């Protein structure tokens, strides 16, 4: 299962380096190319709420094998694609399979291990998953420099087949099946809500925030999610049991996770764009720059897990966010002559900060939930993280695009001429990226402030959970 999650994560990270080249090959804008990432995260965000139902309805073995087969189908479609719409379709099919894997893996960990050992277990999972971003950009860079981009997908096919074969032979079931009826109305509301909301954020990059298309999409999305939330809170068999938010540490860490995820995913988009589009570095050089930080991050994850089991998440989160914010400040004054070594050091520092807080924050919230809500809590946590990543990426690309345009107009109005237009475009792009990093710092500060309120709490028993939910239902009626 960890190997399957590794492949899904690897597939997601290789696109950050490939985006600039795909923009040229398909003659598309950054806002359009961003859909390869946003669309992937969007499908994850739509599908993951349903995984809580899937994890109860199907066995671990059935669900994992089905998700890997879907992922394989999407990989094949992406590999043979010759147009951007076909490539995007393949990516979304991949996302449908990948969206099931991580919630399923997390749920298995929380089923097998007691609360006082989950940090170390999640740390080992984190090591395997973080190793994918460590080699993903470098591997993608090497392929793009020496071969065609299609090889990134063709190369994944045999490994996915091996995971399916090994899963079929060795994977055992660890959860009990619960036969329940799927709430189709909830599925429709969830799909419309997350789909239109993310579409609105993505279109804002090219259409602007005053566009009626953007405003209507966001309004429809928020309305549908409001109806979805109401239905989950009043249903006897909710698709996604939102009563998990009645547990204070789960709610708090979920909000912090939103901020942390937006900071992490946005940087995965901005730095490759700066390196390749503004500085002229190759895809391989861009990937190599990200390699040291990702390797250090992967190495620290198991250590962080053990520290969490011993000390809790509060100070790991605070220290991690402080390091992340300080090193992100180093990215707000980039120029066309910023040294490669400086970028490596700042990027590595950001990854160290991320390693200290990612798994502890998620594990701290899920640890409080009773066993009956673990699957729902896992699905909620992963849904929000995926949506936050997509919204964060869309928001930061919007900021970068709009600020780049503003800076370019200012340069032209202060004596710029057509002869130096190419240089001004590069300079305006760099300044737009700097402005986007300022927004990242602001989001990180919100997460830092909230981290001071994290407390170490134990898992709520099923008896206490039942009493708490009964009180909630009485209030609702």
Regions found by a protein language model. Name each.
Residues 417-424, 454-477:
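Intrinsic disorder in cytosolic terminal tails and internal cytosolic loops
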Residues 42-46, 76, 130, 134, ...:
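Hydrophobic/small/kink-forming positions within alpha-helical transmembrane segments
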């Amino acid at each position: 299962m960890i190997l399957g999650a590794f492949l899904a994560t690897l597939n997601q990270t290789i696109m950050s380096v490939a985006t600039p080249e795909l923009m040229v090959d398909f003659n598309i804008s950054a806002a359009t190319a961003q859909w390869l990432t946003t669309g992937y995260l969007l499908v994850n965000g739509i599908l993951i709420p349903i995984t809580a139902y899937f994890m109860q309805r199907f066995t671990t073995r059935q669900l994992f094998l089905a998700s890997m087969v879907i992922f394989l189908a999407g990989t094949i479609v992406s590999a043979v694609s010759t147009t951007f719409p076909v490539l995007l379709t393949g990516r979304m099919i991949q996302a449908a399979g990948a969206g099931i894997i991580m919630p399923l893996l997390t749920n298995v960990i929380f089923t097998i291990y007691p609360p006082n050992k989950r940090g170390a277990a999640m740390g080992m999972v984190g090591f395997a998953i973080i190793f994918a971003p460590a080699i993903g950009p470098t591997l993608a860079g090497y392929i793009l420099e020496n071969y065609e981009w299609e090889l990134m997908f063709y190369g994944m096919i045999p490994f996915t087949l091996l995971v399916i074969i090994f899963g079929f032979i060795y994977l055992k079931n660890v959860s009990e099946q619960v036969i329940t009826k799927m709430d189709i109305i909830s599925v429709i509301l969830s799909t419309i809500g997350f789909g239109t909301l993310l579409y609105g954020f993505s279109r804002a990059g090219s259409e602007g925030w005053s566009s009626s298309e953007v405003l209507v999409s966001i309004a429809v999305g928020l309305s549908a999610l409001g109806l979805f939330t109401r239905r989950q809170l009043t249903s006897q068999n909710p698709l996604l049991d939102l009563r998990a938010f009645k547990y204070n540490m789960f709610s708090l860490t979920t909000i912090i996770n939103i901020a942390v995820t937006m900071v992490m995913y946005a940087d995965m988009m901005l730095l490759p764009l700066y390196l390749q589009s503004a500085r002229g570095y190759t895809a391989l050089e861009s990937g190599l720059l990200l390699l040291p930080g990702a390797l250090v991050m992967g190495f620290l994850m198991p250590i962080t897990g053990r520290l969490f089991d011993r000390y809790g998440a509060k100070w790991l989160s605070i220290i991690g966010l402080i390091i992340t914010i300080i090193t992100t400040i180093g990215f707000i004054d980039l120029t066309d002559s910023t040294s490669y070594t400086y970028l490596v050091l700042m990027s590595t520092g950001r990854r160290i900060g991320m390693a200290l807080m990612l798994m502890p924050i998620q594990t701290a919230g899920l640890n409080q939930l009773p066993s009956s809500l673990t699957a729902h809590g896992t699905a909620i946590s992963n849904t929000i993280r995926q949506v936050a990543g997509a919204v964060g990426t869309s928001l930061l690309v919007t900021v970068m695009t709009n600020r780049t345009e503003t800076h370019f107009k200012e340069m032209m109005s202060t004596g710029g001429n057509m002869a130096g237009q190419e240089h001004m475009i590069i300079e305006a792009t760099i300044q737009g990226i700097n402005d986007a990093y300022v927004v990242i710092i602001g989001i990180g500060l919100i997460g830092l402030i909230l981290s001071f309120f994290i407390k170490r709490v134990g898992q709520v028993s099923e008896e206490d959970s039942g009493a708490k939910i009964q009180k909630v239902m009485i209030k609702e009626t």
